[in-house]
Swiss-Prot record:
The cysteine framework is V (CC-CC). Keywords: Disulfide bond, Neurotoxin, Secreted, Signal, Toxin. Residues 1-19 form the signal peptide. GO terms for molecular function: ion channel inhibitor activity; toxin activity. The keyword Cell membrane does not apply. Contains 2 disulfide bonds that can be either 'C1-C3, C2-C4' or 'C1-C4, C2-C3', since these disulfide connectivities have been observed for conotoxins with cysteine framework V (for examples, see AC P0DQQ7 and AC P81755). Residues 20-60 form a propeptide. It is found in: Secreted. This is Conotoxin TsMLCL-04. It comes from Conus tessulatus. Expressed by the venom duct. It comes from the Eukaryota.
Amino acid sequence: MLCLPVFIILLLLASPAAPNPLETRIQRDLIRAALEDADMKTNERFLEGVISTIKDFAGKVCCSVSVNFCCPTA
């Protein structure tokens, strides 16, 4: 009969210590997703193409506004 209270006390102490499987699964998925996002890299060729297009457009706009200031003399 003395074992029953001891068993109940141990059961009460052990149950909050057990991890919630759903919570740990969600945390594991979030960590994995963060690592995959950090591993993604921008395509350098794409970025160079965008920058080149912006430079060309800015040069055309600048030359149409002020020829003496922006456009190099040929």
